[in-house]
From Swiss-Prot:
This is Ribulose bisphosphate carboxylase small subunit, chloroplastic 3. RuBisCO catalyzes two reactions: the carboxylation of D-ribulose 1,5-bisphosphate, the primary event in carbon dioxide fixation, as well as the oxidative fragmentation of the pentose substrate. Both reactions occur simultaneously and in competition at the same active site. Although the small subunit is not catalytic it is essential for maximal activity. InterPro entries: RuBisCO_ssu (IPR024681), RuBisCO_ssu_dom (IPR000894), RuBisCO_ssu_N (IPR024680), RuBisCO_ssu_sf (IPR036385). PANTHER family: RIBULOSE BISPHOSPHATE CARBOXYLASE SMALL CHAIN 1, CHLOROPLASTIC, RIBULOSE BISPHOSPHATE CARBOXYLASE SMALL SUBUNIT 1A, CHLOROPLASTIC-RELATED. This protein is coded by one member of a small multigene family. The basic functional RuBisCO is composed of a large chain homodimer in a 'head-to-tail' conformation. In form I RuBisCO this homodimer is arranged in a barrel-like tetramer with the small subunits forming a tetrameric 'cap' on each end of the 'barrel'. Residues 1-56 form a transit peptide. Induction: Accumulates to low levels when grown under continuous white light.
């Protein structure tokens, strides 16, 4: 058996020989110019790159007092038309709208130092996911109903992709005053 394996290996090596002699190495990604050995010293500080003077209009989010909630929390509260546009985007991507509500609109820990089920990551779902929903007005009507039932709670809209089994978008639809 060992002699038959050696014979088949020798035949395979003999066949591979002529094919390799006709192959040419691939050089398309190589540069013909070598890398520079030294860098040019830039002692002139007036030529440093800038952002066109836009720094003066940037602000820093204050770390105390203003909580960030979800994806669009840095914007002013969304109007009904803005919510409808977001829900239309959600529906165009074939995501299932879900409405959730919670007393606290952010992650918090009151029972233990390590993360757990009751630390604000999981919100209560309002009714069932809206499978088969094709109109943003249906989702807006459910948000209004949730606001009426729980006026002191946060309400958020989630877009769930049931093909990939992931949550793709989440934003606050209502903040209590």
């Amino acid at each position: 058996m060992a002699s038959s394996m050696m014979a088949s290996t020798a035949a395979a090596v003999a066949r591979a020989g002529p094919a390799q002699s006709s192959m040419v190495p691939f050089n398309a990604c190589r540069s013909s110019v070598p890398f520079p050995a030294t860098r040019k010293a830039n002692n002139n500080l007036s030529t440093l790159p800038g952002n066109g003077g836009r720094v003066s209009c940037m602000q820093v989010w204050p770390p105390e007092g203003l909580k960030k909630f979800e994806t669009l929390s840095y914007l002013p509260p969304l109007s009904v038309e803005d919510l409808a546009k977001e829900v239309d985007y959600l529906l165009r991507n074939d995501w299932v709208p879900c409405i959730e509500f919670s007393k606290e609109g952010f992650v918090y820990r009151e029972n233990h130092a390590s993360p757990g089920y009751y630390d604000g990551r999981y919100w209560t779902m309002w009714k069932l996911p809206m499978f088969g929903c094709t109109d943003a007005s249906q989702v807006i009507a459910e948000v209004e109903e949730a606001k009426k039932a729980y006026p002191e709670y946060f309400v958020r809209i989630i877009g769930f992709d049931n093909k990939r089994q992931v949550q793709c978008i989440s934003f606050i639809a209502y903040k209590p005053t």
